[in-house]
Amino acid sequence: MDIASLAFRTDLAMLEHSGSLVEHRETHLVVRTPDNPTYWWGNFLLLATAPADTGEVQGWLEAFEREFPDARHRTFGVDGTKGRRGDLAPFAEVGMDLDVSTVMTATAVHEPPRPNTDATYRRLESDADWQQQIALDLAGEEPATHDVDFVTARSEAERRLVAAGYGAWWGAFEDDRLLASMGLFTASPGLARFQNVKTHPDARGRGLAGTLVHRVSRYGFDDLGATTLVMVADPDYLAIRIYRSVGFADTERQLQAERKPSG
């Protein structure tokens, strides 16, 4: 199965770089993350096309259960570049949650309108830095969505990406306290993908994220040799305006459907 979606192509590259397995089928891909089986979007099916009706969705649910018999979640991606929420309607009809994300790209960047010059911007290096990254990742999140074990396992995968030389994780620090962070990694020659952009709830609205995105983007162009940077964003969340303010433009849409674990 050839993948058209820039978002899923870079998603899969990041997952494979950190140890996930991708199995190609004729009509779909099976993505597994053995080291983190509760990672919803590390253990999912990527479909070539959206299901036509609820009967087809039921078939995909059964396929998921065969591939992941111990999983409590159900997660499906749908390949493509210009899909719309309506394409996922059969998933909604069986009670699944839908997500349509905006895929953004940049071939050049500029400073945000109000850069933050008070913070120190640098790579995460020490164990203490990475412990702060785990705490930042958990800040403001619902425990049922992001528990300590899950976030710790994801952090370990992120450190493996850094250790393997694919890129770096960067942070904005004030008085050695991590207030914002993000990763940027090579997905394929000339293409780099941002990962898990996060600002502490108490530090939002101060220009940290925009300044950090700009600086990390320069790292991507200058050090990683990227010609195109990829960012996936929630179209309804304020952060998308921050990314646009430094030069990212809407390019594609990414379609996903999920059913969270019950209980």
Question: How would you describe each model-predicted region?
Answer:
Residues 77-85, 201, 229-240, 256-263:
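Conserved beta-strand-loop-alpha-helix junction that forms the acyl-donor binding cleft
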Residues 1-10, 45, 50-52, 102-103, ...:
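Short amphipathic alpha-helix that is part of the acyltransferase structural core
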Residues 1-71, 82-84:
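N-terminal charged segments
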Residues 82-98, 206, 210, 235-253:
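Conserved active-site alpha-helix within GNAT-family acetyltransferase domains
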